[in-house]
């Protein structure tokens, strides 16, 4: 029906498994977009009324109030069967399909859908960057050459996870393994171990590389920041209030990875994507100067003033090429500049700019 109405791409619901997506691909000649990373809904896509009743906003209209991330008491025959350590009975783990990306692509998925509309720039940029890397790897090397680096999984966990990841319904595995019962939000990654606590002078052992500026969680209300880089396996000392429950042997999680945040800031935030273009400048005496810009098979030409004879300093091809390549902070980079120039003509620098 959607194809008959003119749809060229359909987005599958998150509860579909890969076999169902493959069957859909074989039956319909339309592009398929499927979810691969981010939050999962507890309810069926488009059929949840819990948010409307419990939060006053419709999840079916993109305004979910997140009732599945709230704590609940669970009863069986009148007896409470959960406690505060597993009170988030409706909160699924986040999905990560990176390890099974070849299966996803081979099932017929044309476009990967990544959560990001309500996420910060670090999340959106880094998750997309990592998935782009492995899509390219699969396309270049095939299934045999596809291998996910553990560091990339660690980076995804550092950015956001709700107690490890799940592949969701893609492999038809359902139940408790998909759930994050103890906590509904970012759980960080286990990074430090308390070696000793001497009246607030805490010695930590780094289980992973620690970066200056990393943020570590003590409890829901308290955290501290690393003041230096520390290699995995090394120890370091931090002075903290005695009241904090940092007993010997406790594992402390990193909630914010400063290195990842800096990478995104340096490579994505405020960076203008560059387009490589070719230019052809035609300078003929007694004719309008013209510039043609070429990009990906598209050509656009603009014309300027009439070119006149130089009285003192004629234009040179070298100088014109140099000025053409001065694109400043625009999105263009001049890869090749061709100049067709008559001898002895005058070209003001302002014309080229």
PLM region spans:
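Surface-exposed amphipathic alpha-helical tracts and adjacent flexible/coil segments at the periphery
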Residues: 3-353
């Amino acid at each position: 029906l959607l194809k008959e109405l003119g749809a060229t791409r359909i987005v599958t619901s998150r509860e579909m498994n890969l076999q169902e997506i493959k069957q859909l691909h074989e039956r319909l000649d339309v592009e398929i977009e499927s979810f691969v990373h981010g939050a999962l809904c507890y309810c069926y896509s488009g059929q949840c009324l819990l948010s409307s009743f419990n939060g006053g906003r419709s999840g079916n209209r993109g305004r979910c109030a997140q009732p599945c991330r709230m704590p609940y008491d669970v009863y069986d025959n009148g007896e409470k069967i959960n406690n505060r350590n597993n009170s988030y009975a409706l909160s699924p783990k986040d999905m990560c399909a990176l390890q099974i990306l070849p299966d996803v692509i081979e099932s017929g998925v044309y476009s990967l859908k990544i959560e990001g509309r309500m996420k910060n720039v670090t999340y959106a940029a880094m998750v997309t960057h990592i998935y782009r890397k492995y899509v390219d790897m699969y396309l270049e090397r095939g299934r045999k050459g596809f291998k996910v680096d553990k560091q990339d999984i660690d980076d995804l966990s550092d950015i956001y996870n709700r107690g490890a990841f799940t592949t969701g319904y893609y492999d038809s595995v359902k139940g408790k393994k998909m759930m994050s019962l103890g906590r509904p939000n970012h759980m960080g990654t286990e990074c430090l171990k308390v070696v000793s606590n001497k009246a607030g002078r805490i010695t930590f052992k780094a289980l992973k590389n620690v970066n200056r500026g990393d943020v570590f969680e003590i409890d829901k209300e308290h955290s501290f920041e690393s003041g230096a880089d520390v290699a995995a396996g090394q120890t370091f000392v931090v002075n903290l209030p005695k009241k904090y429950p940092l007993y010997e042997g406790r594992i402390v999680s990193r909630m914010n990875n400063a290195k990842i945040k800096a990478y995104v800031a340096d490579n994505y935030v405020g960076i203008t994507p560059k387009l490589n273009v070719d230019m052809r400048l035609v300078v003929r005496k007694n004719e309008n100067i013209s510039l043609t810009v070429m990009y990906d098979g598209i050509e656009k030409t603009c014309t300027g003033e009439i070119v006149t004879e130089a009285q003192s300093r004629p234009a040179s091809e070298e100088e014109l090429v140099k000025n053409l390549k001065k694109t400043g902070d625009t999105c263009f980079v001049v890869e090749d500049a061709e100049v067709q120039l008559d001898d002895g003509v005058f070209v003001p620098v302002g014309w080229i700019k």
